[in-house]
Amino acid sequence: GDTNYTAFVGCTDQESGELLGKWFIEESGLKEGDKVAIIEGPMGQSGQVGRMAGFEEVGLLDYFDVVATQTANWKRDEAMALAEDWITTYGEDLKAIICENDDMGMGALSAAQAAGRDDIIIGGVDGLEDAVQAVKDGTYGVSVLQDSAGQGATGVDVAVAAAKGEEIAKDTRIPF
């Protein structure tokens, strides 16, 4: 890995992928073998790679029948277009659309609602305001939220300690 930094404070994209994957397996009400689709971030970008690794780690790709996996480049409109195609292609068999971020999740939700498919379970990562509201409204399955306030506060503490020449941890993880 890259060692040319003083300290890292945060959580990993893999952890967010693991949490999202576990939710779909354990909490969503979906059954093993159900057909799902995955909307990814830009291929090769760290968020996409990490979140997909998280899905793999918890067995999501083996538990479900993943009928489609494609990038929407973190964009709502691209995700909506993909979801529209998949809803048409797979019909009633498509049970869920798992999104690597909430902006794409909101696009998939718009497509599902427009198609009258309120049964499709959709979830993502980021804790976007409209995604959190949609979870409260019962239209969006889940939004995995990274604790940005905790990351920011701890980041400041670590930076101050480093500036004072105090010993600091090279890697500080902030729980979700």
Identify the role of each PLM range:
Residues 6-7, 35-43:
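Short beta-strand segments enriched in small/hydrophobic residues
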Residues 39-43, 47, 57-59, 63, ...:
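Hinge/cleft segment of the Venus flytrap/periplasmic-binding protein
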Residues 9-34, 78-79, 128-131, 147-164:
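Hydrophobic alpha-helical segments within soluble ligand-binding/sensing domains
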Residues 16-20, 46-64, 78, 82, ...:
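Short, solvent-exposed amphipathic alpha-helices that sit
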Residues 23-31, 58-61, 85-89, 111-115, ...:
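Structured segments of extracytoplasmic/periplasmic soluble domains
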Residues 39-50, 69, 98-102:
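Extracytoplasmic "Venus flytrap"
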Residues 55, 68, 72-133:
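Hydrophobic alpha-helical
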Residues 4-5, 31-35, 61-67, 92-95, ...:
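Loop/turn elements at helix/coil->beta-strand transitions in domains of secreted/extracellular proteins
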